[in-house]
Design a protein with these regions (language model features):
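Bacterial N-terminal signal peptides
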Residues: 9-19
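Ala/Thr-enriched low-complexity intrinsically disordered regions
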Residues: 4, 19-22
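Bacterial N-terminal signal peptides that target proteins for export
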Residues: 1-10
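Noncatalytic, solvent-exposed loop/strand surfaces
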Residues: 21-444
Length: 444
């Protein structure tokens, strides 16, 4: 006879497993590029057609400007913005778009002009590219707390009610940033740790004080420093700079965060900061495109439109299986937009609008098509389709197949730099003016 108590336990366990998986994959988009940091959504009903008036659940203005992407947990949507010199943390309601709270965390200026003085002095402080400002790092949440980071190094943790739990400044604590085009790396949350990366000009070729690139972890609840690891590379000057966010990789026996920048791809233990492996000599200059993973292979672009390289990782250890890259591809590679992988294929978009599809295993190019416009937003993979959004707010959707097929072109009518977020079959896009939720309106 079946034990009813045991049956209840088994049923409860099954429900918990299903619920946990559903909440994590379909409801929440907790960080930049989503739950796995790879811009892949499990949604089956994400819209493919919309306009500035059609198939829009809501559209709300966002004060100021920013390049950060929204993060989502349940009915909470978080974003950052810079309004003049005010650095703002914002919370919106997912179903209505209502701005639930706005917190001025600090003030700062996105300096555009280099420092004048002796040769090399302009490298001793950061300046910002005209396309972005201090609100470039995206927020991250674990469902209880949310972390905001700004380009001047201001780091703050709040609860969902908007109470600030702790604040600190990376430049004040760790030294002045020497990043050529403005700090933009997004933070991560791993267990009870907030992990930040700073990759910057070492100033090694100049006389005087030097600068370090580093990873640093803080307790999520208290802001207490837990570990700090210097990230050493052989890069020089601007080549040291990297604006990328690490990506998680969970091998059978090892969880690691993988970073591209400083002409180097490497991995670290997120619990301790220990470096696990590195690949040097990936020369290409300063790096904006972050790595992505598809089927135990890391794909990364070597700096400014450098080769796209594929590094195979062992399924158990997570270590590279070979000294050299499995393959590399050099034509029309991206300078800003991250690769995205799905179903054994890799998709990239160059800054000037060449969309391409490659075989993830051997680098075979299946198609290379110019789809129009200039791009900074990273593409999204969802339900057998790839979403490419250009600076003018035109989203071109293509089939994620070996044959180039355009599904739709959608016009938002506002400029877009930020990468999209997905939750409950709705697409959230942050434009230069607004936050837009694309999909069927929610019922009251």
């Amino acid at each position: 006879m079946f034990n009813t108590n045991l049956g209840k336990v088994v049923l409860l366990l099954l429900v918990n497993v299903v619920t946990s998986e559903t909440v994590f994959s379909d409801t929440n988009w907790p960080s930049w590029r989503g739950p796995n940091g790879n811009s892949v959504s499990s949604s089956k009903l994400l819209p493919t057609k919309w306009s500035d008036k059609e198939n829009v659940a809501w559209k709300v203005p966002v004060v100021g400007d920013g390049a950060s992407s929204p993060c989502i947990w349940g009915d909470s949507v978080f974003l950052t913005a810079q309004d003049g010199e005010k650095l703002l943390a914002l919370k919106f309601d997912f179903k209505t778009g209502k701005n639930l709270w706005s917190k001025e965390l600090s003030t700062g200026e996105a300096i555009r002009d280099p420092l004048r003085g002796k040769p090399g002095d302009q490298r001793r402080r950061q300046k910002f590219h005209k396309l972005h400002n201090l609100a470039s790092p995206s927020p991250v949440t674990d469902g209880k707390a949310v972390v905001f980071l700004f380009g001047n190094g201001d780091l703050a943790c709040a609860n969902f009610e908007g109470t600030i739990l702790w604040k600190k400044n990376l430049q004040k604590d760790q030294g002045v940033f020497t990043i050529w085009w403005g700090y933009a790396n997004s933070p991560l949350i791993h267990d009870n740790l907030v992990i930040c990366t700073v990759m910057q000009d070492s100033l090694d070729d100049l006389e005087g004080e030097k600068a370090q690139s580093f990873l640093i972890a803080y307790e999520l609840n208290t802001g207490k420093e837990v570990w700090k690891t210097q990230r050493k590379t052989i890069a020089k000057a601007e080549s040291c700079d990297s604006y990328t966010t690490p990506i998680y990789h969970k091998a059978a026996n090892q969880t690691q965060i993988i970073i591209m920048g400083g002409n180097q791809l490497d991995a670290y233990n997120p619990n301790t900061g220990k470096q696990l492996w590195k690949k040097e000599g990936l020369n290409g200059g300063r790096t904006i495109t972050g790595p992505t993973i598809e089927q135990n292979t890391v794909f990364a672009t070597q700096g400014m439109r450098g080769p796209l390289v594929a590094i195979n990782l062992d399924k158990s250890s997570g270590l590279p299986t070979n000294e050299k890259a499995a393959w590399e591809y050099t034509k029309n590679t991206p300078d800003s937009c991250c690769p995205v992988g799905t179903n054994g294929l890799i998709f990239i978009i160059s800054d000037n609008g060449f969309a391409q599809c490659l075989d993830a295993h051997n680098g075979t190019i299946y198609w290379n098509e110019r789809i129009g416009g200039d791009y900074k937003s990273s593409p999204l993979a969802c339900n057998g389709k790839i979403y490419f959004t250009n600076l003018e707010g035109v989203c071109t959707i293509v089939e994620a197949t070996k044959t180039f097929t355009v599904v739709a072109k959608n016009i938002l009518g506002e400029g877009v730099i930020a990468s999209p977020a997905v939750s409950r079959d709705h697409l959230l896009i942050r434009t230069r003016k607004s936050l837009i939720c694309i999909g069927n309106p929610f019922s009251n």
